[in-house]
Amino acid sequence: MSLPARLRDEFAQYDDDSVVVTIDPATRCLLMYPISEWDIIQEKLDKLPSFQAQARRLQRLLVGHATDLDIDKSGRILLPAPLREFALLDKKVTLLGQGKKVEIWGQDQWDLQREDYIAEGMHGSEQFDSLTDISL
């Protein structure tokens, strides 16, 4: 998979020639992090209580699927088959920058998810007080 020049430039700020890709346990997409950002997340995951089932499940899903991938000189990464299969990736993918990470979606999956988000609107069942100060 080729990374757009803009993303390559952003990852270059971290002085990393590789990234970590793992699954998103909440949706059928992949999460791609610079190595240095993933190290922070993994440290937090490692501190979760090992006797809590939900914590162990999250560790198994995120850390268990975390894969270090080199970015080649052409700005490409080779996603392993299990990650591609999880996210239902085919030839067309969508990359969504999300701050310090990038979501990798199969184009068809993203189109469906985006339509669901739009149909649900901002009046979904979850209310976040922290969003009340955001103006678009």
Place the predicted regions along the sequence by residue.
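A positional/architectural concept
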Residues: 1-29
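Short, basic amphipathic alpha-helical segments that act as recognition/interaction helices
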Residues: 26-38, 101-110
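Helix-adjacent hinge/juxtasegments
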Residues: 31, 35-69
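Beta-rich strand-turn-strand
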Residues: 67-76, 81-90
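C-terminal end-helix/capping segment
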Residues: 96-123
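Acidic/histidine-enriched, glycine/proline-rich intrinsically disordered or flexible terminal extensions
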Residues: 117-136
